[in-house]
Amino acid sequence: MDLKFSNFFKEAEHPALVKKFDKSTTDESSSKEDYSTMSDLWKMFSKAKSELSNGRRVENLTWRLMSINLQKNLTPNGDSNTLTPDTFSDPTAPSSAQSVPPTSSAETTADNSDTEMKLNPIPAYSVPADTTGSSLMEFNYIQRRVRKTSFDESTAKSKKRSIADSHFPDPNAMQRPHDLESQPFSYPKIHASNSFNFVKRDIDSSNFSNLDASALPISPPSDFFSVHSHNLPNAPPSIPANSNNSASPNQRIKASPKHADTDVLGLDFDMTPSEPSSFPENGGFPSFVDANTHEQTLFPSSATNSFSFEHGSAGFPIPGSVPSTSYHANTASEDGFSSSYNSQGLFGISSPLSSGVTPNQSFFPDVSGNNIFDVSRNNHEVSSPLIQSPGSYVSMPSINMVSSLPISAPVPNSNSQFPRRPNTFRTNSSKSVGQGSSGVDSNQENAESFNPSISSHNSAEWASGETTGHSSNSPLPGSDMFSPQFMRVGTAMGVAPVRSNSSNNFGQNFFHQTSPQFSAVPHRKVSAQDTNLMGSSPGMYNHMPYLNRATSANSITSPGVLPEGMAASLKKRTTNTAATPQAALPTTLDTKKDRSVSFNINKNAEKPTVSNAAEDKKGDANTRRANATNPTPTCTNCQTRTTPLWRRSPDGQPLCNACGLFMKINGVVRPLSLKTDVIKKRNRGVGTSATPKQSGGRKGSTRKSSSKSSSAKSTAADMKPKADSKSISPGFVGGNQSLSSERIPLDPSMRSPLQQQSSENESKSQSMLSANNLNAGVNDFGLGFSEGLGSAHLDSNDSSMVQGKNDFAPVVDSPLFDAFDTDLGMSSVAESHTMNMDPSDLSRVSKSWDWYSVM
């Protein structure tokens, strides 16, 4: 400060300014007087701030000067962090050891005695150390006003306590008298050793008077997500035991706040969204309390703190967060409960966000070589998450990095004295996640190595819903109480129903859907040959649009398990989903070759023998199967591969633009004899939609009927269609268009184009008879009307044709009826008795709404 400015303050009227910059007054008595004068100066400006232009700024300046002067006075006492006195406090407050000596009346004059600020005593507990990071606040140095109540402010660091404050006991709780008014907050009775098994038995509220502060586990709020080892018997050497933050097991039995018996209901705590709720012990909800965890090793992870509940003296569970991160083999958390469950997620019906699982987490981690599950197992029975056994509780971790789903949740001990609660995941308990079970994201492909307790389920047993000891296989949550036919489960694409169908591996797949984190987890792409995952679980993954097509198509590989009416809808959904039916449908029913039915009409249809060698090769079964995987679609009626627009038949098969429009307009299948007429009339040219590349009979775009007809006559005699004595193929083979249409009933030995798995050992005499009947039914291109869907003639006015249709009208169990009339309760598409009908005669089942799906 320069000399001019110093002289200005020395010449000021107020003596406080003069003394402030007078270097002669530096002794201790003058410093005390400086404080008094600065207080008077601040009071003067605070009263006159309304009259001054910058009154607020001047008042703030004097306030700061007064506080600086006070801090200088308190520095020799070693209490530089003590706050400034409150000018509004009561002078008659009780004294304390840390109070600053008040200014004596001898050192003050009579003029300022009425306005002198007497320093009030500051209780030790009323001004706690600042741990909230508010030291940068402007008025942090101001002393908090001493309240006239006996409220202990050391228990409340702020108005809204943090999560750590609400979960850890006060280390000074035993040092203060047990006063109800001084203990407004009730702390959860938490013990860092997870030794709830003997704490619940031995703790007694009457012994609280014998406790001291050393018995309490002290955990600062900053250690909320850190790992503490608490002198457990089997604590690994890699985690050092912190003796400062732990107590011996004998001390920990008694370690509970002295005011524990005052919190009767256990409800006066801060519930955050990540905490589970507390429920009565014998109610319909579980009390998630860990048990038998003091005899196992710690779980070496810093992110798996488990919320636990301890029963107080009144018998009500009180929530808390245990800082110990022990992971034990004899608790239910070893059996896969390592994900973030809340009280709603345990019941299998939870929103995708309730568990906090990120999409990059695998909900079935690879357990081989994973230290997470490498824990020593003792021959103890593990209590189920919702069935309580004596002295046994379930540890539900709230924060972890490994999300897994339970495969087996063991049943409780037989001597359980508590009422049985509905088990969430009630399956056989012969195997657990830690013993090498596998899931969707595991690399084990053997179905039996997945989990024998699940893969060997008796479907009738789990469907009955009986819970008989170790054989209780009810997959639905609490299925002994309720078992809905459909459940609404949140998926990644929204809410979709889950069908409760019985199958061998159904319990495994149900866990993948009803768990909270299932909906947010992307799935590994399952091939159609993964029968251990998908083959025996019909309809499980059909409501999930994010699965691949082969998975949804493979869901009907076990037709015997499908209920009535469901197989048809599943088949229709699978057929409409597949973009190329030749690629998707042949693998759909590949596992059951004796019952296989493919809707690819031209897949196994026999071709006429022509001079082209490629056509002979296409007639081979292996080549046809390889051709089925060709991504290029083929018209199921005229066999063409080039068309300006692809359409679909009512059963979902691809049709060219001409055949699709003809079927949509006329309601019947377009005859192959009309193919050249349509092309000739419109003068399409080479490479049009009606070019039958597979027939090989037509070389150009224009029709030369004489040569084509003669070639067709010569090749028709060599055609030998496959025969099947079980097949009944009602239909009509029309003659050439120039001839009158006559009704020729097909021989029963003729093979329908849709029934593609034909037997090779039929007699050739029947084949020759069928070939003779087809001689009159060869079109201009050498292609018989049995090829494709050409059995229906265009001439709908022919009475003989209509009469023939009526002859076969009573036969109705056709796959086409299953694909549309699912309300009729038809049987499954893939069952053997549904293959006795030729569905190519679409006019027999046509309705007014059938052809809306052609587009």
Swiss-Prot record:
Bias kind Low complexity: ranges: 240-250, 428-444, 625-643, 707-717, 755-767
A Pfam family it matches: GATA
A molecular function GO annotation: DNA-binding transcription repressor activity, RNA polymerase II-specific
SMART domains documented for this protein: ZnF_GATA (SM00401)
Compositionally biased intervals (Basic and acidic residues): 149-168, 614-623
InterPro entries linked: AreA_GATA, Transcription_factor_GATA, Znf_GATA, Znf_NHR/GATA
GO cellular component: cell division site; cytoplasm; cytosol; nucleus
Localization per Swiss-Prot or TrEMBL: Nucleus
Positions of region (Disordered): 72-126, 149-184, 229-287, 412-483, 602-643, 680-768
Keywords noted in UniProt: Activator, DNA-binding, Metal-binding, Nucleus, Phosphoprotein, Transcription, Transcription regulation, Zinc, Zinc-finger
Biased composition (Polar residues): 72-112, 445-476
GO biological process, one term: negative regulation of induction of conjugation with cellular fusion
Modified residues (Phosphoserine): 150, 727, 729
Zinc finger (GATA-type): 635-659
Stated role: Transcriptional activator.
PANTHER family, sorted: BOX A-BINDING FACTOR-RELATED (PTHR10071:SF281), TRANSCRIPTION FACTOR GATA FAMILY MEMBER (PTHR10071)
Protein name (record): Transcription factor gaf1
Organism from which the protein derives: Schizosaccharomyces pombe (strain 972 / ATCC 24843)
Source taxonomy: Eukaryota, Fungi, Dikarya, Ascomycota, Taphrinomycotina
Name of the gene this protein is made from: gaf1
